[in-house]
Swiss-Prot record:
Cross-referenced Pfam families: ubiquitin, UBQLN1
UniProt domain STI1: residue ranges: 194-233
Biased composition (Polar residues): 362-379, 389-400, 438-469
Record's protein name: Ubiquilin-3
Compositionally biased intervals (Low complexity): 280-291
SMART domains: STI1 (SM00727), UBA (SM00165), UBQ (SM00213)
Species name: Mus musculus (Mouse)
Domain Ubiquitin-like: residue ranges: 22-96
Gene3D superfamilies in alphabetical order: 1.10.260.100, DNA helicase RuvA subunit, C-terminal domain, Phosphatidylinositol 3-kinase Catalytic Subunit, Chain A, domain 1
Ranges for domain UBA: 614-658
């Protein structure tokens, strides 16, 4: 331990009157010593004092405090060293010159031009072992930068305070290191002598090409001397790469850079640490296949995950060239998703289409005929919805079994007849709706059966308004909710669940048949004829549409504000039943809920303009391209193509701005 009265070395400055005596702890990886000095003492004076204790020349000592290397002219007070603080010490190896010291075995550095090696100094090691055994940056012992205990320093606490960039910059500023690194051929040879680098280059020849380029080696050494320049270069490179993807063809350039440079280097590093044992052979083969570089530009748009597989595949087949009949069929098939998409049903149908078991249960399930003993007699004015004519009033005959079987078939879904929920509860409290009805009513089941199934086309038949009440003796179809639930629970579920979801579940069979029938060109031709007829009726006789669709309230704008007709009228003397009564408003609301999706489909068909269909056929290829890009709004795409005269790029810009 040094004492407070210990004299300073020769040539040191006398302490000023306001100087204070402080104690500084000098710590090495293995030793720790305390020194008493004044706070105005310079770093050079402190090194001279420390050199006597550690038996080393002052030029070999490097003092580090707070992550910074202390400079000789600065004082302890200027560096922030106060009483009780610790300064870390690194002892460099002494440099030996050829003329003054006895020669030891010099290191033979292989190189293409040995004469270019700087002659001012030579590289020696303590035990005579060759230096640079691990390359330029790993063999620090041969550069005279370490002491005998330097191998223990990476695990010590000293490295928590060392600023690595500044230390590397100071090392590179050494004249000997600069002269050594200025010879790119020598640096290349030193790197190639490393067995790890040799193995890396054998596995990845691209790295060898980088080492063979003197300009790249020169730039690397320049960046090594100037860390701030390297950081700026990396920042600008990241910015350039981020902007490159937005340039046409930039994605392929990034992919080539990754497959040719980055991917081999990452694979080489992974091989050194061992492969991943959890990677299966399938994953490895997939990675190998996908890592092959693509030499051609990608002209196909990326698939849109939100579009249906059917629509995208149809668009790709259309580019390959098909027959005219197939094009018309594809055009007709692609028109229905736009209609169903407007009312929010297409995605749900696509999900059901992917589950084959549910489709089988919907399309193949038939309702068994009920036991005649369980069938209750019909009321006077009640007519089965699917019968072509109504039986006589008051006959009291039960419903035939053939009619029950027809109603249970999948070709005539239960949605086509009005549900018993409009007029019956658990046991069957019925309202006599037919007594007070005025005027003819609709035959909506027959109309929907024509659209839903081409095999069951029947003529329009006018039946009384009592069609809105179902026959209590007819069993329900499997896809309808069971009648055992109470009306209060069903009403609560209707209020809580979104309205469109209830409509989809109630009217699912018709929509499934619509989707299946779209593949038949004759069915599409019939739908187009119905579409043209609805357009004529909407313009020439709008009130006639209300006769076909009495519960359609959405056509009030078409009819010019005509009054909506009441579909159900309460009887003056209802029969008392133990089950709770269903009010008129509730029955009308439920009737509108069950029938509104089909009427929305009819509105979509009726609102389609023939001129728009011609434009869709004209811009069919462009519309498929826009749909593949993710623009799913058919109307907006068509308007953009009309405004840009079929230019897809201009249409995309217009759609983005809108």
């Amino acid at each position: 331990m040094a004492k407070s009265g210990e004299a300073l070395p020769q040539g040191s400055l006398a302490p000023a009157q306001d100087s204070q005596l402080i104690r500084v702890t000098v710590k090495t990886p293995k030793d720790k010593e305390d020194f008493s000095v004044v706070d105005t003492c310079t770093i050079r004076q402190l090194k001279e004092k420390i050199s006597h204790r550690f038996k080393a020349h002052p030029n070999q000592l490097v003092l580090i405090f707070a992550g910074k290397i202390l400079k000789d002219p600065d004082s302890l007070a200027q560096c922030g060293v106060r009483d009780g603080l610790t300064v870390h010490l690194v002892i460099k190896m002494q440099r030996r010159t050829i003329g003054t010291e006895c020669p030891s075995p010099p290191v033979s550095i292989p190189g293409p031009n040995p004469g270019e090696i700087p002659q001012s100094s030579s590289v020696y090691s303590v035990d005579g072992s060759p230096s640079f055994s691990l390359g330029v940056l790993t063999g620090l012992s041969g550069l005279g930068l370490t002491s005998g205990s330097f191998s223990d320093q990476p695990g010590s606490l000293m490295w928590q305070h060392i600023s690595v960039p500044e230390l590397v910059a100071q090392l590179v500023d050494d004249p000997f290191i600069q002269g050594l690194l200025s010879n790119t051929g020598l640096v290349r040879q030193l790197v190639l002598d490393n067995p790890h680098m040799q193995h890396l280059i054998q596995q990845n020849p691209e790295i060898g090409h980088i080492l063979n380029n003197p300009e790249i080696m020169r730039q690397t050494m320049e960046f090594l001397r100037n860390p701030s320049m390297m950081q700026e270069m990396m920042r600008s490179q990241d910015r350039a790469l981020s902007n490159l993807e937005s340039i046409p063809g930039g994605y392929n350039v990034l992919r080539t850079m990754y497959t040719d440079i980055m991917d081999p280097m990452l694979n080489a590093v992974q091989e050194q640490f061992g492969g991943n044992p959890f990677v299966t052979a399938t994953t490895a083969s997939t990675t190998t296949t996908s890592s092959q570089p693509s030499r051609t530009e990608n002209c196909d748009p990326l698939p849109n995950p939100w579009t249906s597989t059917y629509g995208v595949s149809g668009g790709r087949q259309g580019r390959g060239g098909r027959q005219s009949g197939d094009q018309d069929a594809s055009e007709n098939r692609n028109r229905l998703p736009s209609f169903l998409g407007n009312i929010g049903l297409f995605d749900y149908l696509q999900q059901l289409h992917e589950t084959s078991q549910s489709l089988e249960s919907y399309l193949q399930g038939t309702v068994p005929t009920s036991n005649p003993s369980q069938e209750s007699p019909l009321s006077g004015n009640r007519v089965p919805p699917t019968l072509p004519s109504s039986p006589k009033s008051g006959s009291g005959q039960s419903l035939p079994k053939e009619s029950v079987a027809i109603k249970g078939k999948s070709s005539c879904p239960a949605f086509l007849r009005h549900s018993t929920e409009n007029s019956t509860g658990q046991g069957g409290s019925l309202h006599d709706a037919g007594k007070g009805s005025t005027g003819p009513s609709t035959s909506l089941p027959n109309l929907t059966s024509q659209i839903g199934d081409s095999a069951n086309r029947s003529s329009f038949v006018s039946t009384p308004s009592s069609l809105m009440s179902a026959t209590p003796g007819v069993p329900e179809s499997p896809w309808l909710p069971p009648t055992g639930y109470s009306r209060s629970l069903r009403s609560a579920g209707t209020n809580q669940v979104p309205r469109i979801q209830n409509e989809i579940h109630q009217q699912l069979p018709l929509l499934l048949h619509l989707q299946t029938a779209m593949a038949n060109p004759r069915v599409m031709q019939a739908l187009l004829q119905i579409e043209q007829g609805l357009q004529i009726l909407a313009t020439e006789a709008p009130r006639l549409l209300l006769w076909f669709m009495p519960c359609l309230t959405g056509l009030n704008g078409v009819t010019g504000g005509t009054e909506a007709r009441e579909g159900v009228v309460m009887s003056e003397d209802p029969r008392p039943t133990p089950t709770p009564q269903i009010s008129l408003a509730q029955g009308s609301t439920e009737l509108g809920i069950h029938s509104s999706p089909f009427l929305q489909v009819l509105q979509a068909l009726a609102s389609t303009n023939p001129q728009q269909l011609q434009l869709e056929a004209h811009f069919r290829v462009q519309l498929e391209q826009l749909r593949a890009m993710g623009f799913l709004n058919l109307e907006a795409n068509l308007q953009a193509l009309i405004a840009t005269e079929g230019d897809v790029d201009a249409a995309v810009e217009k759609l983005r701005k809108s």
